[in-house]
Amino acid sequence: MQCSWKAVLLLALASIAIQYTAIRTFTAKSFHTCPGLAEAGLAERLCEESPTFAYNLSRKTHILILATTRSGSSFVGQLFNQHLDVFYLFEPLYHVQNTLIPRFTQGKSPADRRVMLGASRDLLRSLYDCDLYFLENYIKPPPVNHTTDRIFRRGASRVLCSRPVCDPPGPADLVLEEGDCVRKCGLLNLTVAAEACRERSHVAIKTVRVPEVNDLRALVEDPRLNLKVIQLVRDPRGILASRSETFRDTYRLWRLWYGTGRKPYNLDVTQLTTVCEDFSNSVSTGLMRPPWLKGKYMLVRYEDLARNPMKKTEEIYGFLGIPLDSHVARWIQNNTRGDPTLGKHKYGTVRNSAATAEKWRFRLSYDIVAFAQNACQQVLAQLGYKIAASEEELKNPSVSLVEERDFRPFS
């Protein structure tokens, strides 16, 4: 009788195990992105060739957009910010840099870099755990009772500008535009914001303050995190043109060169070469596919995203294992064929994306482009950016300067 009882117990346990396995298999099975896109009116256009991906719905995904200034990172950030189940933060490492690195050094020394990277990794680790209190160490003046009005670009985060973190007058689903967020929301309560973070399945952070993917290795290998790195790159010539227009004082000598046709003797060429060196070092690491980056790294060229934003966004979400939200699809539809007058704000995201990616060719003189091509020839070749052999070729929009490359995720 005792043996029969044990046999029944074993059978029951086996049955539970089988059911659990079946449930796990079902929840992790492939879901097609098209049902969500149908709500945005995009299914007919996208579903025929849209790939299917296996989605992991049980574990929080931690996403880091690794980029540099004027590479399209604000646009990529919005691809996550618009997802209803993603908690997105725009440049929280700004606070680290602003607190630790003296403005006059701009963080260029090796010592500054080590200090910045160590503090940045600690902060990122805490933020991915939704520990927003850790950010208070870098906010001036210090928050009082965990409330502050000093969060950098708070308005760029959808969650921080909507209920329950912000309670403006209006409908329950109201999300404020960035310019209205701070004015109408008042002080940010970090306790409430942290709770909103914990309620979401994924956390995404954008940064332009980590030079290379190798600087993130400790976080990538941290078993407590499910970190996936989206490295965004852009043609360095395009970055130079965009920075010269946006940061007019800092890049004054480049503008002087463009205006006079003569290269200033005291031109700070590191404003260009540092970008190229960081890209080259980071991409070399990523494309070598070291074991610690397996399933953790995806290289995205801004030009590919600009030419086909929906297709590339689907690939990104597929790599992350997250279903594509219809709100993201709708945002792409509304913000990649925009009125050019709406894209004049230097940090704006409403634009004709394909035209924006090529605009640099008409904003730099050929002698500046030739100089950049010589200084950055290694990374241009690595990333598939073609050399403009003449001014005629540079200014001819029918001649593409971007090679067809398939930078597949390392999975």
UniProtKB/Swiss-Prot annotation:
GO molecular function: keratan sulfotransferase activity; N-acetylglucosamine 6-O-sulfotransferase activity; sulfotransferase activity
Entry's Gene Ontology cellular component terms: Golgi membrane; membrane
Functional pathway: Glycan metabolism
GO BP annotations, alphabetical order: galactose metabolic process; inflammatory response; keratan sulfate proteoglycan biosynthetic process; keratan sulfate proteoglycan metabolic process; N-acetylglucosamine metabolic process; polysaccharide metabolic process; sulfur compound metabolic process
Subcellular location: Golgi apparatus membrane
Lumenal side: 24-411
Function of the protein: Sulfotransferase that utilizes 3'-phospho-5'-adenylyl sulfate (PAPS) as sulfonate donor to catalyze the transfer of sulfate to position 6 of internal galactose (Gal) residues of keratan. Cooperates with B4GALT4 and B3GNT7 glycosyltransferases and CHST6 sulfotransferase to construct and elongate disulfated disaccharide unit [->3(6-sulfoGalbeta)1->4(6-sulfoGlcNAcbeta)1->] within keratan sulfate polymer. Has a preference for sulfating keratan sulfate, but it also transfers sulfate to the unsulfated polymer.
Name used for this protein in its record: Carbohydrate sulfotransferase 1
Organism: Homo sapiens (Human)
Record lineage: Eukaryota, Metazoa, Chordata, Craniata, Vertebrata
